[in-house]
Design a protein with these regions (language model features):
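Functional transmembrane core segments of multi-pass inner-membrane proteins
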Residues: 3-92, 125-130
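Short, basic/aromatic-enriched C-terminal tail that caps enzymatic domains
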Residues: 108-130
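Helix-loop junctions at the membrane-solvent interface of multi-pass transporters
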Residues: 33-36, 97, 118-119
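Interfacial loop-to-transmembrane junctions
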Residues: 93-116
């Protein structure tokens, strides 16, 4: 997952594209996981949020599905919503710092997913030891 995340972030940052070969297979696995476990469907809130408004590319939607489902498995709806909010905040801050409105969103999505996933994992580990 680390290598996949780094590769996607670099490609999107340099070319403003998320390749189908790296986003479609995980998105399909995420959809299959939602069929197997409806609780994981909370993860589809992330790509659904991008379908509502303009500005997000199809690659962002395909990336959001596996990230959202993985976070739903780790921390439920809260983890998904926290990552969506953090990704948006990171994108706004990065755009402000770069002085432009249009920029790739994938790197911030991946950073947010890793941050929230790490937090949820640490929280679960600490709770398990108490």
């Amino acid at each position: 997952l680390v290598v996949w995340s780094i590769v996607l972030a670099r490609i999107d940052a340099n070319h403003s594209r998320l390749p189908n070969g790296l986003t479609v297979p995980p998105a399909l696995v995420a959809l299959a996981a939602c069929v197997a476990s409806p609780y994981l469907a909370w993860g589809l809130a992330w790509p659904a949020a991008y379908l509502v408004g303009p500005g997000m590319g199809g690659g962002d939607v395909k990336l959001a599905a596996p990230l959202g489902v993985l976070l739903a498995a780790l921390g439920g709806p809260f983890a998904v919503l926290a990552a969506v909010g953090l990704a948006g905040l990171l994108t706004v801050v990065r755009g402000w710092m770069a002085g432009r409105a249009a920029l790739p969103h994938g790197p911030q999505m991946l950073a947010a997913a890793w941050a929230v996933g790490t937090f949820v994992g640490l929280k679960s580990s600490i709770a398990a030891t108490l």
